[in-house]
Amino acid sequence: YVLYLDGQLVASGCVPLGGDHISNDITLMTGIPLAQAELLKKTEGDANSFSGKTNEMVRVRGEGNMKDAAIERNVLNEIIRSRLLEIFNLVKSSLPKDTFKGNRCHGVYLCGGASLMRGVGELASHVFGVAISRPTLVKNGAPSYLDDPRYCTAIGLIRYAQILDAELPQQRSWLGRVLGLFGRKNS
């Protein structure tokens, strides 16, 4: 996470939890193989669901020699919701205490693959009490994967390195420095 207030970096850190932990939780709690747990999370899960259909079963086909898997929807959603609440509350507790008071914080951007899950934005908004967004890039003919929240952290780090590199004074070669002594420009 990174916190900017008034254009200044105020806090940053890492909560070493994410979407893969949700899939692991589903596997540990239900015995469903990890590949199927991941698929159930992505296709059937809802982080903000308070489904009244407590016994509704959701299913995912087994691949190869794996059996089909099934789980009650409310159990799946509760596993997802519990882990995401933990993640969001860990981030919130790591931030300065007055971050969300008054008009200091205008919103939260969600990144990573788990941010694409149903209900994640609503759950995050409930925890942080502010508007929730997902980062998007200005369209300039760039490949569509650059707009994908799963890649925004890596792309952001690359972009940050590019900006830092552009701000460094350009170093001239040895020959350019020697010629510079005589008033010639190195081209």
Tell where the protein language model's regions lie, with residue ranges.
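Helical "lid/coupling" subdomains associated with nucleotide-phosphate turnover
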Residues: 2-187
